[in-house]
UniProtKB/Swiss-Prot annotation:
Family of the protein in this entry: Belongs to the Ycf3 family.
Record keyword Translocase present: no
The protein's name in its UniProt record: Photosystem I assembly protein Ycf3
Residues in TPR repeats: 35-68, 72-105, 120-153
GO BP terms in the entry: photosynthesis
Amino acid sequence: MPNNQNRDNFIDKAFTVIAESIVKIMPIADKEKKAYIYYRDGLAAQNNGDYSEALEYYKESLLLEENKIDRGETLKNMAIIYMSNGEEDLSIETYQKALVENPKQPSCLKNIGLIYEKRGRYAEQNGDLDQRDMWFDKAAQVWSKAVRLYPGGYLDIENWLKTSGRSSIDIYL
C-alpha cells in the first residue's frame, strides 16, 4: 500500500493533468488561460513551500486576471505567504486588497483578526493593557464580520467573541 505522500503526489499530478485538459478545451480567452496557469503554478509552488516562486507566479496571474473572485483568491494566497513569512503588515494590506476584489471571503477577515489578536496577546504580555484592548477590539471587529459571512464555521472565534465580552450575539446569521 502506498504511503500518504505518494498518494498525495498522485492526486496532485492527476489533478494537474485534469486541470490542464480542461483549460485546453474551455472556451475562454488565452489571457484567462494564462492567468489560470500562473495561478495554478503559484499554488503548486506554495504547496511545496517555495514561497518566493509562488509569489512571482501569483503576481503574473494578477497582471492577466480580470475576474474579481479569482483575483481575490490569488491575493488571499499571497497574504497567506506574507503571514507565514512574518510580514504581518503586508499580509493585512494584501488581505484587504483581496476583500476589495471579493468581499465574501471570511477567511481573509479571520486571518486579519488572528494577526490583531496575536498583537493583543503580545501587548498583554508586555503589560500594555490599553494596546491589548485596542488590538483585541480590532480583532473582534473583523471576526464579527467573518462569522456573519460564515456562521458556524469559526466556532472558536464565536466562543472568543462571547467569552471576551466583545459580542452579545448568540447566533450569527
